[in-house]
Amino acid sequence: TRETYEAVTRRAGSWRAFTRGLDLLLDAGIKVRLKAMALRSNAHELDEISSFCRERTKDFYRFDPLLHLRFDGDPVRNEEIKAERLSPEEIVAIERADRTRFEALQNECEKGELVCPELEHQSCDHLFQCGAGVESFSVGYDGTFRLCSSLWHPGTTYDLRAGTLREAWEEWVPHVRDLRGAGAGFLERCRRCALVNLCLWCPAHAALETGAMDEWTEYFCDVAHARAAALLPDDMTP
């Protein structure tokens, strides 16, 4: 509804502007793909949001219940974000309620794409086990080069105004991807967790939550284990 949409955007008239813009795109024959964030402020309307989006999307719609904190570390805004986060149990409940999403997650678990038991024997201490900087990167409006759009931690970005794209890609990316973790949270938990793909944890998000790229994050961990308990047979749940 307009009320819920504008409670999230905090801008009067934004619902009308959004629907007008979307209608213009659709009327022009432009295919769109829609995504929504699942927040405490809109969780009561997720069914309606899903119906609205699926009627208009070119192929699929998804919602994301995992909120990371702000890149600038603003403490007031970060508390507002935390207040909008759903509990692990609420996240599982809304995923169960969306049959298409839940079945897709189950299928991916069965194929071994979301749960990786082999990681439990991981000995590598490289921080970046993800695809950041492997086939893509991000460049901000100010010329800041990042391995991914969420990676803002000091010492991981490159100023293209003071160097070249070739240097960033061929020299800086390998340097950042070679960084090692020394924190106990990373070494004893996250790097050896089979549920990493059910979790929001990564070096970039850990830095936003804790200030360190190799720290464990309780909320992410609780969500991952709650999702695993819902998706996996009892004998497969870590």
Q: Across the structure, where does each feature detected by a protein language model lie?
A:
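Flexible mid-to-C-terminal extensions adjoining Fe-S/redox cofactors in radical SAM and related proteins
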Residues: 125-127, 144-145, 150-238
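Radical SAM enzyme [4Fe-4S]-AdoMet core and its adjacent flexible, acidic
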Residues: 1-142, 146, 150-160
